[in-house]
Amino acid sequence: MLSSLKNPRQAAAQLLNFGLILSTAFMMWKGLSVITDSPSPIVVVLSGSMEPAFQRGDLLFLWNRNLLRETDVGEVVVYNVKDKDIPIVHRIVRKFGAGASAKLLTKGDNNAADDTELYARGQDYLERQDIIGSVVAYIPFVGYVTILLSEHPWLKTVMLGIMGLVVVLQRE
């Protein structure tokens, strides 16, 4: 099995093949980002705050509407809080004003209180530019793999090792 590594040309071809797979995945992600006008067009629900609408591990597909279009009450959006890395999936429950200057208040369907405590210090409401995108579709539980990989880092190492071995040992 490892005899294929003795030929440097074949080993280089395998390495290039692996790089091609990674770069293709990256280009597909960036292309999807451009099409959806969202820096993160696919997100995973990380908590139970949106139950029963979305469960932990659901994979959400986002579409970021044009900033000039209205964002409506009842719409499920994903937003980033300043200085925090994890996007939040919650529903818009109140809207003050109209257009790009509208102020938005969000809340998780399974939460008792609104999100004002989650917003950045001194921020009482979200603005349209805080929204990463609106949820347009989802696939139940597919994103649970991501949750497992973040909760158990050793799984990530095992998966990467297996993928690397498959690429190296594959014969063409």
Swiss-Prot record:
Compartment annotation: Endoplasmic reticulum membrane
Keywords: Endoplasmic reticulum, Hydrolase, Membrane, Protease, Signal-anchor, Transmembrane, Transmembrane helix
One Gene Ontology MF term: serine-type endopeptidase activity
EC number: 3.4.21.89
Chief location of this protein within or outside the cell: endoplasmic reticulum
Role, per record: Catalytic component of the signal peptidase complex (SPC) which catalyzes the cleavage of N-terminal signal sequences from nascent proteins as they are translocated into the lumen of the endoplasmic reticulum. Specifically cleaves N-terminal signal peptides that contain a hydrophobic alpha-helix (h-region) shorter than 18-20 amino acids.
GO terms of biological process kind: signal peptide processing
Name listed for the protein in its UniProt record: Signal peptidase complex catalytic subunit SEC11
Database matches in Gene3D superfamilies: Umud Fragment, subunit A (2.10.109.10)
Residues in the Cytoplasmic compartment per record: 1-14
Keyword Kinase annotated: no
Lumenal side: 36-172
Membrane topology: Single-pass type II membrane protein
Active site: S49, H90, D115
Family: Belongs to the peptidase S26B family.
Subunit and partners: Component of the signal peptidase complex (SPC) composed of a catalytic subunit SEC11 and three accessory subunits SPC1, SPC2 and SPC3. The complex induces a local thinning of the ER membrane which is used to measure the length of the signal peptide (SP) h-region of protein substrates. This ensures the selectivity of the complex towards h-regions shorter than 18-20 amino acids. SPC associates with the translocon complex.
Gene: SEC11
Reactions it catalyzes: Cleavage of hydrophobic, N-terminal signal or leader sequences from secreted and periplasmic proteins
Region C-terminal short (CTS) helix, annotated ranges: 158-169
